Amino acid sequence: GSSACFPALRPREIDGVKYIDGGWRDNMPLDLAAAMGAGELLAVDVNGVGITRPNTTGLPTRIIRSHWNLGPTLDFAPERAARNIALGYFDTMRLFDRMGGTAYGILPDSSAFLKNFAERYQLRLAEVAARSPAIDLVEKTARQLANYPAPFAPNPSAPTAAALAPLELAAEHLNVPADMPYTPKLLAATVMGSFEKDPADRFPALLDGKDGSLVAEKAMAAAAPEEFVTALVSRTLADVPLF
């Protein structure tokens, strides 16, 4: 275990045998589980220090990974531990299709909010692209850099993880807490309550066609694509009823 993490901590000795953290051989010993008779594998990748070997077992395998930085190896703060437990729970529920989203724990929701948001977001994005064709690449770059899925083709407004991605990306950019579950509508409302100055105000020429320096705004969007997507999400949510 981590109590034997070498060289940060000394090896542990049990019955005359010294032990160090297993991560120095394999962080996810899937081959060991297979050798012990497992017919299906469920692994957790915490992106920790050590070696993670490729899965060569040939067994059906699911791997739980976190979108978030889980903190330093030796950070034992109770607050971080509680946050990581919540994030791990959401990651597991998402893997088994009990929750949606990519980074946040998105609860099942029968309302039409996500569909309406996705349709309006794509319409807004198309309007901006008509003013600046390169903006599509900016939006896709924001998703890629922040590890969110690309727009779902052939229907980019379908209520999928890809359709939810811009909303999650904006939430992450605005530091919306990830250790609690949200419906899409609640996440949207939390996003809209997370700023004092509307991010969309930085892009009046791009988003609304108002007089301004389109060239400067295009450069700003390219330099900080996550800020542009956050602004576009804000402008989209202004058009979608939340209550």
Predicted feature locations:
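Patatin-like phospholipase
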Residues: 1-243
